[in-house]
Amino acid sequence: MSGFLEELLGEKLVTGGGEEVDVHSLAARGISLLGLYFGCSLSAPCAQLSASLAAFYGRLRGDAAAGPGPGPGAGASAEPEPRRRLEIVFVSSDQDQRQWQDFVRDMPWLALPYKEKHRKLKLWNKYRISNIPSLIFLDATSGKVVCRNGLLVIRDDPEGLEFPWGPKPFREVIAGPLLRSNGQSLESSSLEGSHVGVYFSAHWCPPCRSLTRVLVESYRKIKEAGQKFEIIFVSADRSEDSFKQYFSEMPWLAVPYTDEARRSRLNRLYGIQGIPTLIVLDPQGEVITRQGRVEVLNDEDCRGFPWHPKPVLELSDSNAVQLNEGPCLVLFVDSEDDGESEAAKQLIQPIAEKIIAKYKAKEEEAPLLFFVAGEDDMTDSLRDYTNLPEAAPLLTILDMSARAKYVMDVEEITPAIVEAFVNDFLAEKLKPEPI
């Protein structure tokens, strides 16, 4: 266990009081679940979360007081109760050390040292954190993500009775009545044998309403093609009236608005951090893609349904948002040359498949996304924003969250060059240039 934790967190953490703690001591204490709390002292929601999380942490750990108290480990025993095997580590986005110190001072858990900014960025990228506050739970032995939305855990299970909050099968979470907009009620068992789109959306969200209009047409085309497909709307509306108004535009099913517990469990199951989000499942309830929104917008005729992920994507207006999700390899080509984009995809696909398979075997997301970028206004804007040369072909890795780029400017790009470039990046052998 200690090897994984040291690789993830480094050798030292600090307490709120500034004392150093050896990471390997967490293994000695029998920690089974690790919470990573991503936040910042300047964020009011983070301040609110810290207060509720301190009470939650105290209750689960059995500390003397359900709030800030002595350093982690207080009250630990040789064979702690399972819920005491929880530890939390704060990962800060603060840019001012004094503000960071003031914020962590009263935290009863551990924190990544302020100086570990590079490690902070690695954690953001590894777990695809897109906003703060965020709280995720990991199996402390394997590193596998147990729960991506710890904020809902604190709200829904304040006593920690469901510890360690591992994922449950979709069939179990969705079990219960589902509605159609005409008032008809169906049991979730009616989904048997169908691909399912789980659609997290809300009427107050303009991008959601835009996607819904497109999705209605996609749903119709898929059904007319004879595919067994159903969509389940999971509302984030702020009132039942808004839910009803929005749902009236939809030809598919919905979790009843009044069933807040089931809606929350679905959000927890898929770690939803923003809307609109469309998760596409196979008939066994396993995730095919979390990028249903991008797929629907890119595939007007739904010919690629059910949209199994492609190792290499062609960069477009609709999928460019994925550049912000973590490091991305982007191969820029001269698309005026017929077949250049397809040849570029074939060039980098073998290494993309190898990386994806390697991390899938570890039940982890791949640390890189892979794109080919042709010549268009969006690509020109990306080159301008990242201050890249006009050369083509041009092999790059862009890390927007770290505001860093890595450029391999050579006359000829071969599979061996691509693989060496990727491996050197993953081994942290490349020197970044600022974006």
Curated annotation (Swiss-Prot):
Enzyme Commission identifier(s): 1.8.1.8
Catalysis performed (reactions): [protein]-dithiol + NAD(+) = [protein]-disulfide + NADH + H(+); [protein]-dithiol + NADP(+) = [protein]-disulfide + NADPH + H(+)
A Pfam family the protein falls into: Thioredoxin_6
GO cellular component: cytosol; nucleus
Keywords noted in UniProt: Acetylation, Cytoplasm, Developmental protein, Differentiation, NAD, Nucleus, Oxidoreductase, Wnt signaling pathway
MF term (GO), any: thioredoxin-disulfide reductase (NADPH) activity
Top enzyme category: oxidoreductase
CDD domains the UniProt entry points to: PDI_b'_NRX, TryX_like_TryX_NRX
Biological process (GO), any one: negative regulation of protein ubiquitination
Tree of life domain: Eukaryota
Residue ranges occupied by any Thioredoxin domain in the UniProt entry: 167-321
Positions where N-acetylserine occurs in the chain: 2
Subcellular localization, as worded in the UniProt entry: Cytoplasm, Cytosol; Nucleus
Record function comment: Functions as a redox-dependent negative regulator of the Wnt signaling pathway, possibly by preventing ubiquitination of DVL3 by the BCR(KLHL12) complex. May also function as a transcriptional regulator act as a regulator of protein phosphatase 2A (PP2A).
Quaternary structure and partners: Associates with the phosphatase 2A holoenzyme. Interacts with PPP2CA; the interaction is direct. Interacts with DVL1 (via PDZ domain); the interaction is direct and regulated by oxidative stress.
Family, similarity comment: Belongs to the nucleoredoxin family.
Protein name: Nucleoredoxin
Organism for this UniProt entry: Bos taurus
